[in-house]
């Protein structure tokens, strides 16, 4: 059956066109106003944050700030009149001075960085990350992230343990010794597949020898069967034996 024709009411079509135009205009106006309000809010918030920063640090590059953030970055309440800022300064919550004072010798021993005689507080924070070498990775079975020199090989420290991989479950998987300098080679006659991993040739035991032997046996059996058929045809039809046939019951 042909598809039914959609009946359109002229009055409904005209009303829909009118509403569509008005709704599109309202949406465009809403987008413009929303963008203006967002820009005004962002500008006001930026001005408020910048007003709390000292003028000498406002043009500081972000990388320099992240590398060594200054202690007097924000305007204190007592410095508001001296700096001449009109905005209200936001005082940063910091612990009291006696709480921040630490022993210079203890700080130097902890951070391994000499501290000056006049420095009453430790403003340098050193984050020391433990270095994981091959021995630690082998003892704890922690996989090392792949890199240019560690990818594709076992990172065990001992030479005699480089031919195995220990899984987190404790299973030991033997691996062939990889020789990156060894070139590729073609498979031999008795091999089915030969491929290379990291330049070390690995060969899957093929079935070419057994398959060839089976094919030769099948060819011989076919030839012997054909020869026997030819000999039987040349001998003529078979004659039943009538002598001493005996009696049938």
UniProtKB/Swiss-Prot annotation:
Domain of life: Eukaryota
Acidic residues bias locations: 73-85
Disulfide bonding pattern of the chain: none
GO cellular component, one term: mitotic spindle midzone
Coiled coil: 12-48
Skewed-composition ranges (Polar residues): 109-126
Major localization class: nucleus
Compartments where found: Nucleus; Chromosome, Centromere; Cytoplasm, Cytoskeleton, Spindle
Record function comment: Component of the chromosomal passenger complex (CPC), a complex that acts as a key regulator of chromosome segregation and cytokinesis during mitosis. The CPC complex has essential functions at the centromere in ensuring correct chromosome alignment and segregation. In the complex, it may be required to direct the Aurora B/air-2 to centromeric DNA.
Protein family according to the UniProt entry: Belongs to the borealin family. Highly divergent.
Protein name: Chromosome segregation and cytokinesis defective protein 1
Organism from which the protein derives: Caenorhabditis elegans
This protein's encoding gene: csc-1
